[in-house]
């Protein structure tokens, strides 16, 4: 999803699309919406009235087998059931639009969390300015920042968790279908997400932020039985760019030397290997002028550089996993701050003097909001 043109295949033999209403127009109707109208003619697939960037919540108004989460799981199961594994290997990408908003689970999944202890948002000692809605163009329910109260946040979280459980059930159906086709043991399965959701932490909502709620994602790999990988967990900083090299390595295909990312197979097998020290994170301007940042983290410490304002943030994730305290002015973290700042200087220096000049990070007054080839948009701050 989110490709342009929507039907471009990028190496796949075919696609079935659910764009959650984002780009539906007279020239494009997603496969899900076409299917929906055959199953529920005249009904509104957006009957909850919640937008795809809203953080309010409501139960799904229609039978759950009409929900896009169910449709995605059903299409995957049908494809696997009808696939001939003796023909050639199957590469299948199953992308659930949820738990991205709208937070709209069917009632029975929400009921599972009726008595659950839902945590309040984490509120740091640094985020007071975000308590007020900073973007007057946004309505209350899609404001990127704001203090909407703990009860509101817990309600949104309850629906968010329920949507995750809904997805979990669909993944179970897919795994069962693979087993019925005798394809499971030899399958390489990766469960990931492209981003998280702040869910009110530090008065932030949605994504695009350098904080854990937005950037920290699930990353679960089920290896083929032939790889003889012992189940376990790694603390090495891994990222989404590692997926393609991992696929190539597992298929015994040579990984191009200029490819971003690293194969996870050596880590999974416990082999000695040099690994990256930090993950580099970055997002261009979004929601507010100061939300253009670069960050480095090894999972234990995180340094954030805000390019438009020249402000820094430092979080000790070992002692402060919820990022409640910005340690940038703490004397006891002075050494770590200097080390991380120097790492950022080294990281950005290859981009030239617009980012690093005379050994110092540069505050940039103007940046591109969109890339030069982004369809229908002009380059602007």
Residue ranges, per PLM feature:
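Histidine-centered active-site microenvironments of extracellular/periplasmic hydrolases
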Residues: 102-105, 176-230, 239
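A short beta-strand-to-alpha-helix junction
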Residues: 65, 129-130, 154-165, 209-217, ...
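Active-site His/acidic residue clusters
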Residues: 78-124, 140-155, 198
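C-terminal, low-complexity/hydrophilic appendages and adjacent surface loops
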Residues: 33-34, 43, 212-215, 281-329, ...
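Polar, surface-exposed loop/tail segments
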Residues: 5-6, 58-61, 65-74, 90, ...
